[in-house]
Structures are given as structure tokens and as C-alpha cells.
């Protein structure tokens, strides 16, 4: 902001030296009346703001622009007393060509203004620059009516901030009998919250699910004195106060009925102690059917299985037979291994107290003897190959199998392996 240039000239000739145009000079205005009022002149478009009317008594500011867009004059009360109705006509710069003129006046001298000075806008303390006078707003227009605009809208049909469990609890607790039917719960929710008057099928399904899958709600049958359709729903007596201080926005804890949990535990216990064969029969139900069909389709394997169920003395000559019994024995062993998990599904009655998935319950005694017999046969083949009696690719029915006489006879007996793999070792319970 440049400094204020003081004007020393008080005569008309002095003013005409500064402005070549005679129309812009104050020729007819007596300068003696404005000696105290005109103290300074600013040659820019801006206007020094006047804080209060008391600042205009001693010295004012005379603002003038070369574009003749606005003219402001600070006048003292003594200078304003001499201004009459012809004051506006005497000032040539304030004609019709000037868009507007802002004059800061003291409140006591406002009554001296004539009707011709209506174009002079009385500016407030926060008024705009007179250079922008064509776009100047009044004090009432500057304060935009923002209070009428509501930024926070009210939604009367907005979704309430309550869960379905909270809505059901509120409906039941506000009922006189502390129990309501499903239709009464629906009606209470729709009467209280307009949001639920639409899309009824969606939230009504959620209400039914909340009633069914929460232990805090108990279904009560209708009494004979209250005929009608549908059962009553009430709160569980042990549920207590699920909502803190009556605030239904959030539950304190999820209620779980201990009786229901105990009943489920007893049922699980009964399932565990119902018998060792029940889980296996439930898992391998289709396997037993496949085993029965395979036994019917292969009748030749069933007599061999019956022979293995016999005594040990009957099994010894069967192992020590010729090459053709050995080949048939191997075929039967392969067939039994293919259906190893399907043959004996029933548990051993002598060890029914064991764990249902123990080895003794999965395998019977005859199956154990059959597996031990097959292990003895495998060991005999390994010993025979270690002695170099024949090639590994030799068929079992070849004459080279005649060297099996060197095998220890006790290794072929099932009692030999029963001493190694006894029942207590196989028991995993």
C-alpha cells in the first residue's frame, strides 16, 4: 500500500493543474468548508476502511480513481452542515455517469441529506470497495440465508438401529402377558417402525429364524382357554437382562440354554457307548453289501474261507501241499487282501468293551490267523530266494519250488506268529 499523498493546494487553479479535464474538478464547491474534511486523497481503486463514525469527525479520506468508477468522501460534521439540496449538483463527479458513490456519514448528520442524494449508498463497516460499486451488495444481501437450508435431513422411514432379536425382545416385554404370537410380533414391529411396512417377506423370515435359532426365545403352546392359530413366544426365564439398562442397541451376552447343551451331550454319550460296531456299520454300510455280492459272485472263495476257520491241524497239510494248492492259496490271499476292509465289519464279541476303532474290533480272530498265514508264506519265499533256489521271476508252480523243504516247519505254523503278535499287543484301547 503506497503512502498517502498530501494535497497542499486549496484553490481551483491548483486542482485544475492536477486534472486537465475541468469536469473532474470541484469548481463551485467552497474549499473553505472542506479544509478539515479533506485530509488525504488516494489515487487507487481501493478505499481505506472506516472503523467507526468517530474517526470521520476529525479527518476523513477522499478516495478518487481515474476511471471515475467511484468517489468516496469523508466529511466532518461541520462540513456537512453547509450542504443543502444543491450539494449533489455542485459536485460534477457525482452525476449520472458515476455508477455509485459511497459516503461515510456520522449518524447525527444523516437528516441533512436531501432526496437527490438517494444514489449515495450508506456503507456499513464491512462494506465493499467503491471501485466495485456496480456489483456492490447491500448488507442484507450479503448475509446469505444459510439457516433455511437443512444439512442434516430427517429420515422418518429409515431403518431402525435394532437387531431382530432386539425387536422381538421389545415386543414381548411390552406385551401385558409377556408373550406374543408370531403375527402379533409382526404387527407390533410394523406399528412402531414404518420402515418395516415394506419388504415384509424378507424381514419376517429373519424374525422367524431369530425365534427358532436363539435359546432366549421359548415357544409356548396355546392353552384351551385361548383358542386360535399359532403358538406363543416368550423369553426364557433364565435369559435375564440381555440388554444393558434397557438399551436395545447391543446385547451384553449371547444366551445359551444349559439344559439343551446337557441333552446334546447325553445323546453324544449314548452314541459313543451304543456299541463298537455302530460307527463301522454306519461308515461301511455299503461295503458290507459289496462284500456279500462279491462272495455270491465267487463261490470258489467261500469254501476256502470256511477251511481257514477250522483248526490249525487242517491248515498245516494245506500249506505243505503240492504246487497247485500253493497257487490256489496265493490267489485266495490276493482276493482276501482286495477285500480286507470289507470282510469282517462286526466287532469281536469277546472284546466288545474296547475302543470301536481298535484293531481287535476291525479284525476278527479268523482274519488274524489268515494274515499270519500269509506272512509266513511271504517269509518262506524270502528265505527261498536268499538261498538261490530259483529266480525271482519264477512262477510259483514251477519245479524249482521243490526246494521249499529247507524251510523251518515251525515258521509255517500260525502259533509261531501268534506268540510274536499276541492279542494284548494288538489291542490299542
UniProtKB/Swiss-Prot annotation:
DNA-binding region, residue intervals: 159-253
Keyword terms: DNA-binding, Nucleus, Transcription, Transcription regulation
Gene Ontology biological process terms, A to Z: anatomical structure morphogenesis; cell differentiation; regulation of DNA-templated transcription; regulation of transcription by RNA polymerase II
Compositional bias per record (Polar residues), positions renumbered to this chain: 325-336
SUPFAM superfamilies, alphabetized: Winged helix' DNA-binding domain (SSF46785)
Biased composition (Basic and acidic residues): 258-274
SMART domains for this protein: FH (SM00339)
Annotated region described as Disordered, given as residue ranges: 258-341
Chief subcellular location: nucleus
Keyword Phosphoprotein: no
PROSITE patterns per UniProt: FORK_HEAD_1, FORK_HEAD_2, FORK_HEAD_3
This protein's record includes keyword Methyltransferase: no
Pfam families: Forkhead, Forkhead_N, HNF_C
Compositional bias (Low complexity): 287-304
InterPro entries noted in UniProt: Fork-head_N, Fork_head_dom, Forkhead_box_C, FOX_domain-containing, TF_fork_head_CS_1, TF_fork_head_CS_2, WH-like_DNA-bd_sf, WH_DNA-bd_sf
Localization per Swiss-Prot or TrEMBL: Nucleus
GO molecular function: DNA binding; DNA-binding transcription factor activity; DNA-binding transcription factor activity, RNA polymerase II-specific; protein domain specific binding; RNA polymerase II cis-regulatory region sequence-specific DNA binding
Any one GO cellular component localisation term in the record: nucleus
Tissue expression remark: At neurula stage, expressed in the notochord but not in the neural floor plate. During tailbud stages, expressed in the neural floor plate. At stage 35, expressed in the rhombencephalon, mesencephalon, pharyngeal pouches, foregut and pronephros. At stage 44, expressed in a region of the gut on the right hand side of the embryo. Expressed in the adult lung and liver.
Lineage: superkingdom: Eukaryota
Function of the molecule: Probable transcription factor.
Protein name from the UniProt record: Forkhead box protein A1-A
Organism name: Xenopus laevis (African clawed frog)
Amino acid at each position: 500500500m503506497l503512502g498517502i499523498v498530501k494535497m497542499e493546494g486549496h484553490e481551483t487553479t491548483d486542482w485544475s493543474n492536477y486534472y486537465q479535464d475541468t469536469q473532474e474538478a470541484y469548481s463551485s464547491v467552497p474549499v473553505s468548508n472542506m479544509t478539515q474534511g479533506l485530509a488525504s486523497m488516494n489515487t487507487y481503486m481501493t478505499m481505506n476502511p472506516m472503523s467507526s463514525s468517530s474517526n470521520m469527525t476529525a479527518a476523513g479520506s477522499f478516495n478518487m480513481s481515474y476511471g471515475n468508477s467511484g468517489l468516496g468522501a469523508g466529511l466532518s460534521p461541520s462540513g456537512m452542515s453547509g450542504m443543502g439540496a444543491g450539494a449533489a449538483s455542485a459536485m460534477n463527479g457525482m452525476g449520472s455517469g458515476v455508477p455509485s458513490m459511497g459516503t461515510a456519514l456520522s449518524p447525527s448528520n444523516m437528516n441533512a441529506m436531501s432526496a437527490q442524494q438517494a444514489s449515495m449508498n450508506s456503507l456499513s463497516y464491512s462494506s465493499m470497495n467503491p471501485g466495485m460499486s456496480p456489483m456492490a451488495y447491500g448488507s442484507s444481501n450479503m448475509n446469505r440465508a444459510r439457516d433455511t437450508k437443512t444439512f442434516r435431513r430427517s429420515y422418518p422411514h429409515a431403518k431402525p438401529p435394532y437387531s431382530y432379536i432386539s425387536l422381538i425382545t421389545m415386543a414381548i416385554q411390552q406385551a401385558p402377558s409377556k408373550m406374543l404370537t408370531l403375527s402379533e410380533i409382526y404387527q407390533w414391529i410394523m406399528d412402531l417402525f414404518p420402515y418395516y411396512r415394506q419388504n415384509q417377506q424378507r424381514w419376517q423370515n429373519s424374525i422367524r429364524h431369530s425365534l427358532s435359532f436363539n435359546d432366549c426365545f421359548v415357544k409356548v403352546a396355546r392353552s384351551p382357554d385361548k383358542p386360535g392359530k399359532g403358538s406363543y413366544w416368550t423369553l426364557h426365564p433364565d435369559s435375564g437382562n440381555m440388554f444393558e439398562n434397557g438399551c436395545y442397541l447391543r446385547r451384553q451376552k449371547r444366551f445359551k440354554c444349559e439344559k439343551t447343551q446337557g441333552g446334546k451331550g447325553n445323546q453324544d454319550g449314548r452314541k459313543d457307548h451304543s456299541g463298537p460296531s455302530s460307527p463301522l456299520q454306519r461308515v461301511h454300510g455299503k461295503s458290507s453289501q459289496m462284500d456279500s455280492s462279491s462272495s455270491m459272485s465267487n463261490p470258489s472263495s467261500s469254501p476256502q474261507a470256511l477251511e481257514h476257520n477250522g483248526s490249525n491241524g487242517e491248515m498245516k497239510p494245506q500249506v505243505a501241499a503240492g504246487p497247485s494248492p500253493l497257487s490256489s492259496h496265493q490267489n485266495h490271499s490276493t482276493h482276501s487282501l482286495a477285500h480286507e476292509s470289507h470282510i469282517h465289519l462286526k466287532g469281536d464279541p469277546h472284546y466288545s468293551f474296547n475302543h470301536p476303532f481298535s484293531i481287535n474290533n476291525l479284525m476278527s480272530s479268523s482274519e488274524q490267523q489268515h494274515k499270519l498265514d500269509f506272512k509266513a508264506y511271504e517269509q518262506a519265499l524270502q528265505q527261498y530266494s536268499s538261498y538261490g533256489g530259483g529266480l525271482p521271476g519264477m512262477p510259483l508252480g514251477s519245479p524249482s519250488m521243490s526246494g521249499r523243504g529247507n524251510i523251518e516247519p515251525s515258521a509255517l505254523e500260525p502259533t509261531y506268529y501268534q506268540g510274536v503278535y499276541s492279542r494284548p499287543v494288538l489291542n490299542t484301547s
